[in-house]
Structures are given as C-alpha cells and as structure tokens.
Curated annotation (Swiss-Prot):
Keywords: DNA damage, DNA recombination, DNA repair. This is DNA repair protein RecO. It comes from the Bacteria. SUPFAM superfamilies: ArfGap/RecO-like zinc finger, Nucleic acid-binding proteins. Transmembrane segments: none annotated. It comes from Cereibacter sphaeroides (strain ATCC 17029 / ATH 2.4.9). One of its GO terms (cellular component) is bacterial nucleoid. Belongs to the RecO family.
Length: 239
C-alpha cells in the first residue's frame, strides 16, 4: 500500500459516480496530482472542494501508478473571492495555467510556495503585478526563461526597450532600428524597475502569454491557452 500526506491547493473537481469526486491538486512535495475523494459530492464534503481551496491531503493507493484516493481536511477556503470578479478570474487563471503547464506528479516546490502566496494575495488590491511575475516563473518551469539582462544584439545593459518574440531576449532601443514594430515593447515591470502600471502589466502578460502558448503548444494540441486566462486578460484590459 502506497501512502503520503501533503498540503495542496485544489485545481479542479469533477463528479465521479453517484457520490464521489475526482480532484486535481497542486501539492508542495508531490506536484500536480489527481485522486478520488469518496463522498466528494456529498453535502458535507462538496463545499470544501472548491477551486483554490487549500487542503490537508492524505493519498492512498495499492500501487504508485494507480490514481488512488484522497482524504481531505480544509486548511483555507477562498470562497470570499466569489464576490470579486477580478480576484475570482485570477484564481481561475492560476488553477487553469497550473493544470496545463505542470507534468503530473513532478514536484515544483518553489513554484508551489509562490503560487500559494499569489492565491493569498488575490483578496487584496494591487495583485496583478504579482500575477505577471508568477507567469514569468511558470515560463521558467517549462524550461524557457526570458533573458532580459542585456541586449541580444549588442550585449549592452542600457536602454533595453524591446523583447524578441523569437528568442525571448531583450533588445535595446538603438539595436532595434527598423525592426522595432516586430518586437514586443519591454515594460519596466518585467525588469523589476518601479511600480507596475496597468498598461505595463498588460504588456508583460502579452509577452508571457506568447511564450507560454509556444512552449505549451505540444500539450495544447492546437488549442489556445486556457479560457480562464483569456477572461482575466479581458478584465485587466477594462481596469
């Protein structure tokens, strides 16, 4: 019998049979993991199984490769976000992006810590810049990090103004020349310089979205990034 105990955030839930549910969670030590919750559709347990909820999880299976079953205890509910359109959109985007990005059962401890901190921040104003930084981390977890430290053409660290949509590397204003309209504008928010305006966050997310879509293309099978992320982008565009 295989067994472990861990803490995780619920990414998705679907009904299974008459009274059970299959949940997917992102855990601290076991990564993205699915399992059955017996009685998960019951009046007692169903209210606990809400996306974003932080859970104390015990997983058991006869063999490691089996889906197995979870027992769950609530640690933190995030149902307060149900009354906050932008916060709820952020939560749904985080859960959806973790689902499509992470391989099953592969630990990502640093990303887990940063994801929990971001989920905790959603009920406070001013979190979109943190979401942008989180998507940059998510991109790094795919094995493709942006290189914004120096110009890809000249090697200079000064006046970095653009990002190449091919390489993800920064380009200085002078080196861009007539190619500037084919490059992404580089917001200072991605360089960690100064407070991030709403426009800079949108520009930054256009960059991370471009590269996440490209790197995840084999997993998406021609589909775009999750609709939950697109919904968040729509709301941020109106902000």
């Amino acid at each position: 019998m295989m067994e472990w105990r861990d803490e995780g955030a619920l990414l998705s839930v679907r009904r299974h049979g008459e009274s059970s549910a299959i949940i997917e969670v992102f855990t601290a030590a076991h990564g993205r993991h699915a399992g059955v919750v017996r009685g998960g559709a019951s009046r007692k347990i169903a209210p606990i199984l809400q996306p974003g909820a932080q859970l104390d999880l015990t997983w058991k299976a006869r063999l490691d490769e089996h889906m197995g079953a979870f027992t769950v205890e609530p640690l933190r509910s995030r149902t307060a976000l149900l009354g906050d359109r932008l916060g709820l959109a952020g939560l749904n985007a985080i859960c959806a992006m973790l689902h499509v990005t992470l391989p099953e059962r592969e630990p990502h401890s640093t990303l887990w810590q940063e994801s929990m901190a971001l989920l905790d921040a959603l009920d406070r104003p001013g979190w979109p810049p943190a979401y942008l930084r989180w998507e940059m981390r998510l991109l790094e977890e795919t094995g493709f990090g942006l290189d914004l430290t120096r110009c890809a053409v000249t090697g200079s660290r000064e006046d970095l103004a653009f990002v190449s949509p091919k390489t993800g590397r920064a380009v200085s204003r002078g080196a861009a020349g007539g190619w500037a309209d084919r490059l992404f504008p580089l917001p200072l928010a991605l360089l960690g310089q100064g407070p991030a305006s709403a426009e800079e966050v949108r520009q930054g997310l256009a960059i991370t979205g471009h590269f996440l879509g490209r790197e995840l293309a084999p997993l998406l099978n021609g589909r775009p990034l999750p609709e939950a992320r697109a919904r968040l982008m729509e709301l941020l565009a109106r902000a």
